[in-house]
Amino acid sequence: MTTTTAGKVNLLGLTQPQLEQFFESIGEKRFRAGQVMKWIHHFGVDDFDAMTNVGKALREKLKASAEIRGPEIVSQDISADGTRKWVVRVASGSCVETVYIPQGGRGTLCVSSQAGCALDCSFCSTGKQGFNSDLTAAEVIGQVWIANKSFGTVPAKIDRAITNVVMMGMGEPLLNFDNVVAAMNIMMDDLGYGISKRKVTLSTSGVVPMIDKLGEVIDVSLALSLHAPNDELRNKLVPINKKYPLGMLLDACRRYISRLGEKRVLTVEYTLLKDVNDQPEHAEQMIALLKDTPCKINLIPFNPFPHSGYERPSNNAIRRFQDMLHKGGFNVTVRTTRGDDIDAACGQLVGQVMDRTRRSERYIAVRQLAESESAANRN
């Protein structure tokens, strides 16, 4: 359980079983967990005195041993298209970004999992910031909590603005595994936000051992940040591919999807970069690569940021690529750029990373994870 500098337990990031354990640890009945969890997530409460069905003696006990603390809101911007972006400060001192995208009757919240990112994908502005820290479970779910309160949609399940959550913000979610899984469990819990497992999506650049582990502990939708149809190009665009090449990666994704059943499919994300990965031969390679993978493809025209070195393809090039994939038998959509006027579009999230020296440490951790997994498989 996460404790603050004051030694108090932050209840915001606790799952229902963890809350039950907490109440037992302070000599209370387990059913109190459900009462308090509803107050936190359905009503956005951060003051124990507001919990009217909790007795005064217990409220005083909670004040002494616990708190409800989300990230600090630094700023909120609203795009001309209705997209919202929150910049929030986490305990490390860094700022991360959360984006809400309204579209039709759906509202999707894009949530960050780390302050910065160690994977250094060449077309992503977050990776250029380096890596600072993993977010705690409270800091991950706290982004949902903050957004929900900002819309005034409490209780959370009445006229809810947030219908979908995607772990596609800053960071690689599978490198902050335990905290992200805890937060997603709260998202799906009826005592939390009651979001369907089909509407909670985790996006990964491809940490293969953790994809397999994810399938063992939770049932959420999976998205793969592919961005290249062959290993040579993907090694340049998504460096973690050197550790987990495409054959290994897609095998892991297929194993994950097969566990889910229910006609679930992998979402493949592909950022289109002018004259880099948008040519007809790339579409042909992609058709061959994904022919045995149940998937839908989401094409993302590159969203420029300073000094990236990349450009957005022309509309004709985007349509040509989409048409070729359609003819190859795939369900293909082109993501509409949203929120670019407030730097909230895909690939533009940067936040403010206070310590940019840890990228190499995170790569070492990835390598050690792969080596230990390989040793386990040999045994």
UniProtKB/Swiss-Prot annotation:
Ranges for domain Radical SAM core: 103-343
Catalyzed reactions: adenosine(2503) in 23S rRNA + 2 reduced [2Fe-2S]-[ferredoxin] + 2 S-adenosyl-L-methionine = 2-methyladenosine(2503) in 23S rRNA + 5'-deoxyadenosine + L-methionine + 2 oxidized [2Fe-2S]-[ferredoxin] + S-adenosyl-L-homocysteine; adenosine(37) in tRNA + 2 reduced [2Fe-2S]-[ferredoxin] + 2 S-adenosyl-L-methionine = 2-methyladenosine(37) in tRNA + 5'-deoxyadenosine + L-methionine + 2 oxidized [2Fe-2S]-[ferredoxin] + S-adenosyl-L-homocysteine
Gene Ontology biological-process annotations: rRNA base methylation; tRNA methylation
Co-factor binding details: Binds 1 [4Fe-4S] cluster. The cluster is coordinated with 3 cysteines and an exchangeable S-adenosyl-L-methionine.
Localization annotation: Cytoplasm
InterPro entries (alphabetical): Aldolase_TIM, Methyltransferase_A, RlmN_N, RNA_MTrfase_RlmN, rRNA_lsu_MTrfase_RlmN/Cfr, rSAM
Binding residue positions for [4Fe-4S] cluster: C117, C121, C124
Cofactor(s) needed: [4Fe-4S] cluster
Catalytic residues in the record: E97 (proton acceptor), C346 (s-methylcysteine intermediate)
Assigned EC number: 2.1.1.192
Keyword presence, Iron: yes
NCBIfam families from the UniProt entry: rRNA_mod_RlmN (TIGR00048)
Pfam families tied to this protein: Radical_SAM, RlmN_N
Any further remark recorded for this protein: Reaction proceeds by a ping-pong mechanism involving intermediate methylation of a conserved cysteine residue.
Protein name: Dual-specificity RNA methyltransferase RlmN
